[in-house]
Amino acid sequence: MKIEIFIIIVCAVVLAIVLLLLAIAVLSEKVAFGSRYEKNPFLKYFTADDFNLSAQPVTLEKGLKGFIYSKDDIPQKNKLIIFCHGMGPGHIAYTTEIAYFCNFGFPVLAVDSRGCNFSEGKNLKGMYSGVQTAIAAIDFAKEKGYNDINLVGHSWGAYSALCASAKRKVNKVVAISAPISPSITMAEGAVNMGALPRPLVAVIRPFWWMVNFFKYGANGNSSSAKCAKKSGTPTLLIHGDKDKVVTLKKSAFNRAKGQHLTKFLAEGKAHNPYNTENAETQLAVLSEKLKKNEYTDIMQFDFKAATEEDEEVMQKILNFIEG
C-alpha cells in the first residue's frame, strides 16, 4: 500500500512539473507571438516617398498585404526580389534596403506577415507564419508572371526565406542573420533577455517544440538549416560575428551545409550586418533609449544615420543575385 501511494505521489509530482513547464512554454510563446506588431509612434519609419519609389499595393490570401516597389526612372530588371521582414512592424522597417535594390532596377515585393502593420490578423501566431507569408508571396509573384524570383530575408525573414525555398522553387536566396528553428529561437531569446536561466531553458525546449507542432503540424518546427540543404537553391548566408540576437553558434550560417551555399561572415557586425558599424552603434543607442523611455531624445535621433547601408555587404547581395 505504501509503495502504491509513493508511486501515485511521484506521478503527481512529475505531472505537475510537466504541466508547469508546458504552461511556461505556452505563456512565453504568447508573449512573443500573441499580439500584433505595429509601428512605434515615437520612431521614424522611412516610406516610399522618402526615396521616390513607386509603391503598388497588393493583397494576397488571408488578408496579407504589402507593396511592389520600383523606381520609375530606372529600367526594370526581369528579376524580382521578395523581401521577407524580421520581427517588428513589418517591411516598413526595411525601406532603406528595399530602396537600395530598387535603385539598381529590381522590383521588390514586400508583404507584411500575419499580425504585422498592413496585414490582417490579431497576432503573429508563431514563427512559421513568416514562412506561410513567403510562400504566399512566391505564389502571388508567379501568378503575376514573374519567373526569376529571388528571396532576401533578415532574421525571422531569413528563416522564412530558407524554409520557403524548400517548399517552392525560386532562383536564389539571401538569408541574413537567420535563426535555425522556433524552439532554439525561443530558448536563446529567453536566455539573452535574462528571462530564464539556460538550464531551465534546456528543459523547456521540447515543450516549445510541442507548442509549435500543435500550431502548425509537422511544419511548425522546420529547421532553416535543413530546409536550405533540402532545397538545393543557390543561397547566400550572411551573419555578423558579434550578433547577440541570433548568435553565430545557433545560426543557419553555422549549421547549414551544402555546395550550393555561399557564406559571408561580416566581421565586427552584430544583428544587422547590412548596415555600417556606425549605424549598428546608433541602433544600439536607440534601443537603450527605448528601454529607458527617453522619448524626448528619440524625437531628435538621426534615423538616417542608423539605417546607413554597408556598401560592401549590399554589393555582395546584388552580385550574388545577378550572378
Question: How would you label these PLM feature ranges?
Answer:
Residues 3-60, 64-71, 287-296:
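An N-terminal hydrophobic leader/cap segment in hydrolases
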Residues 87-100, 113, 249:
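The serine-hydrolase catalytic nucleophile loop
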Residues 98-120:
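Conserved alpha/beta-hydrolase
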Residues 116-145:
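Catalytic nucleophile-loop/oxyanion-hole region of alpha/beta-hydrolase
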Residues 163-218:
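Hydrolase active-site cap/lid region
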Residues 231, 237-239, 243:
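Short beta-strand/loop motif that positions the catalytic acidic residue
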Residues 244-250, 274:
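Conserved alpha/beta-hydrolase "acid-adjacent" motif
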Residues 278-323:
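Catalytic active-site module of serine/aspartate enzymes centered on a nucleophile-bearing elbow/loop
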